[in-house]
């Protein structure tokens, strides 16, 4: 049998303390860098704090966003500002009815001088992609984008090409103009990590937007833009690993599962919930809820997930994954109201 001497025990204890201190300082530094990025985004996207936080949650959880809101709410600006703060490139794609899959993925170009074909990569090979008004393009174009999101690769001809490891898509939908649109099927919507709803800013925020716009015009004239610390891709990948190591109590894992199962078996909880729900969420929703709750806890400088984290991201994770019944639509019930009711019925384990 092996016995530890007091000297060896103290050495091991000291070394473990040093390792723990190093890990803790590394996590703190990563959170500090993300806090700086969050402040940069907040300075650029005024009056939308929830939008800013959820953009970072998607980045940390390695997922994609669909954003619904009226035009002019800085959706393009948000992704552009995010690209400025990251070691990443950015491309905006305006979806239109005449768009082709090759306009996204790229195409093989013929070279007459040697009779060969050379692949010209499309905009999907950028790190950050804004798919503006995704519901204006036909289904085959939407499918090309969603294949890239789900598989991290695109297929052109007989060849498959890998997309960058850092790859985030933010798709937008305009809730006002619905003529000439191609709504995404529920199975395709499920590929998005979160569905965000953004609204107009209040009067105070709009005044701040005016001042920001004037200040930027002067900055462009004077060529005096402030420098910003750029997060490297390796720092982002390290932060994602830290997020996966966030502690979640078994009781909270059970709570998440109960919330999702309640959308599939609403009759066990409440007649009202049962009458409002046509279809519930898939296991992909449970995975998304877990990843987003962990990312939120990490952003709030905690090494554990709380019930508040789960409840804070629930609406964005489930909004596009549940289907309301005809009765709910007739009563004017929204997805948000249904999810509020769901939270009131399912208790924390």
Regions found by a protein language model. Give the residues of each.
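C-terminal engagement/docking regions of AAA+ P-loop ATPases
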Residues: 23, 27, 265-349
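Conserved C-terminal "switch" segment of AAA+ ATPases
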Residues: 44, 190, 195-272, 302, ...
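Dynamic helix-loop-helix/coil hinge segments at AAA+ ATPase domain boundaries and subdomain interfaces
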Residues: 27-51
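AAA+/SF3 P-loop NTPase mechanochemical coupling elements
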Residues: 118-127, 156-173, 184-185, 190-193
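Conserved AAA+/SF3 P-loop NTPase catalytic/coupling segment centered on the Walker-B
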Residues: 125-150, 164, 181-188, 200-208
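Conserved alpha-helical scaffold flanking the Walker A/P-loop in AAA+ ATPase domains
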Residues: 54, 111-130
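AAA+/P-loop NTPase substrate/partner-engagement loops
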Residues: 85-113
């Amino acid at each position: 049998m092996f016995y530890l001497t007091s000297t060896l025990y103290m050495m091991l204890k000291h070394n473990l303390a040093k390792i723990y201190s190093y890990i803790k300082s590394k996590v703190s530094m990563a959170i500090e860098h993300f806090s700086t990025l969050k402040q940069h985004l907040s300075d650029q996207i005024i009056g939308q704090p929830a939008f800013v936080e959820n953009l970072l949650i998607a980045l940390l959880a390695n997922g994609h966003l669909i954003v619904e809101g009226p035009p002019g709410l800085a959706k393009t600006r948000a992704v552009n500002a995010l690209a400025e703060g990251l070691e990443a490139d950015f491309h905006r794609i305006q979806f239109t009815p005449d768009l082709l899959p090759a306009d996204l993925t790229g195409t093989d170009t013929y070279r007459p001088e040697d009779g060969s074909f050379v692949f010209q990569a499309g905009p999907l090979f950028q790190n950050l992609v804004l798919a503006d008004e995704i519901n204006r393009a036909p289904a085959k174009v939407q499918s090309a984008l969603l294949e890239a999101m789900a598989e991290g690769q695109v297929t052109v001809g007989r060849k498959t090409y890998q997309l960058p490891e850092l790859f985030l898509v933010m798709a937008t939908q305009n809730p006002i103009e619905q003529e000439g649109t191609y709504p995404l099927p529920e199975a395709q919507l499920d590929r998005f990590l979160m569905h965000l709803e953004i609204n107009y800013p209040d009067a105070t925020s709009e005044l701040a937007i005016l001042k920001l716009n004037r200040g930027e015009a002067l900055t462009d004239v004077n060529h005096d833009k402030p420098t910003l610390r750029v997060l490297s891709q390796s720092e982002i990948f390290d932060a994602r690993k830290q997020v996966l190591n966030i502690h979640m109590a078994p009781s909270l894992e059970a709570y998440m599962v109960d919330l999702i199962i309640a959308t599939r078996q609403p009759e066990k909880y409440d007649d009202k919930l049962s009458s409002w729900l046509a279809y519930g969420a898939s296991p992909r929703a449970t995975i998304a809820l877990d990843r987003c709750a962990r990312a939120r806890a990490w952003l709030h400088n905690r090494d554990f997930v709380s019930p508040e984290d789960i409840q804070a991201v629930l609406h964005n994770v489930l909004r596009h994954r549940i289907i309301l019944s005809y009765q709910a639509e007739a009563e004017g019930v929204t997805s948000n109201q249904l999810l509020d009711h769901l939270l009131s019925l399912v208790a924390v384990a």
